[in-house]
Amino acid sequence: MPEAIVVGAGVVGASIAFHLAERGIDTLVLDRNGPAGGSTPRSGALVRCHYPTSLEADLAWESLTEYFEPWGERVGGGCGFTRTGFAYLAGEDRVEALRHNVNLQQKVNVQTQLIEPAELGELDHSLNLDGVALAAYEPRGGYADPTATTVGFLDVARRLGARFERRQVTSLRVRGEKIIGVETEGGPLEAGIVVVAAGSWSGPLAASVGLELPIHPVRVQVALFERPYTLPTHLTVIDSVSGFYARPAAERATVIGLRDSYEWLEDAESWDPKPDTDFVDEAAYLLGKRIPDLEGAPYRAGRAGILDMTPDARPILGPEGPEGLYLAVGWSGTGFKKAPAVGNELATWIQDGRPNRPELETYNLNRFNNGDLIFGKYDPAVRSPH
């Protein structure tokens, strides 16, 4: 009988399992698919720290500097992290908020700075900066491989004694006020600690112990376009003026996702994993407008994924409901870049009864009933799964 069961083998669940195993906690990971079999491999996988709250920026900075950059030494193997530099592009209407948020990020030691369009153009000659009034620049930002990151965490967790089983969890099991395990399609499994990290599929599991999660499944899309040989790379950008993010990818490709491509779903089971034609056309147009070298770039591939969206686009994290139950859900498209630090925090919370960062307790479920929703200076950035 394991001490802990983690439900969900995406990047967040994998990070939690890794950190529990590091602490010597006997851990079993369950997922109806294989590792990284849900939304994680469809992630945009940006690694950046530009957030409108200090807690999010701090978690992303720890993930970058203590995990993604030194991955080989800290975890082992490779996560595909590639440093490109990151820029957040703002129009005149967002300049005040941008100044506020960069100052907020700098206070938690994020290496970021405000940069004028002319200077940004010197850093990346491929950018057409029409409509950009000011930018934030993170020289250490970039992207990683979401599947390699997830599998890397799980591989090391297994070497440390954790186990993975491909099983669908159908409900949580309680006795009195305590969690006692999970029910699966193959029968019951016992554990005194259960962590639910199953993304948009978490709601029915929480409901089995009387918890109603305000999570809504949302379909979002990404497209890959082929870069010419004359453009070997470019900055990773979030373009709040045009409403997209873009980053380089391996084999001369560029990944793009759009702000206005959200599709709210009735459930997380019935959705098209292929991108819509209108989405691809709009993505191609916007990408070519901002990076003229990519105008008319050949479309290579595309995919869609599911976000577990909450009303304030912030997660539900920590102990909830019966004793021994922990949630790590509702990431709303921003889980990937913070997953390493979040796994460390939740493992600490489980072992010590409190997280390293007390402000993580604000990510509780009650905030949605109490009107304590968490918002930053401006709306969440363009999102992709995780």
Spans of model-derived segments:
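Active-site lid/adjacent beta-loop-alpha segment flanking the redox-cofactor pocket in flavoenzymes
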Residues: 212-214, 227-324
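Helical element adjacent to the flavin cofactor pocket in flavoenzyme catalytic cores
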Residues: 136-192
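Glycine-rich FAD pyrophosphate-binding loop
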Residues: 21-40
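Central helical "cap/lid" subdomain
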Residues: 37, 187-234, 353
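Short beta-strand to alpha-helix junction loop
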Residues: 58-59, 88-97, 136-155, 272-279
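C-terminal catalytic lobe of FAD-dependent flavoproteins
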Residues: 146, 285-386
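Beta1/beta-strand and adjacent pyrophosphate-binding region of the FAD-binding site
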Residues: 1-12, 28
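Dinucleotide-binding Rossmann-like beta1-alpha1 core, especially the glycine-rich loop
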Residues: 44-123, 243-245, 287
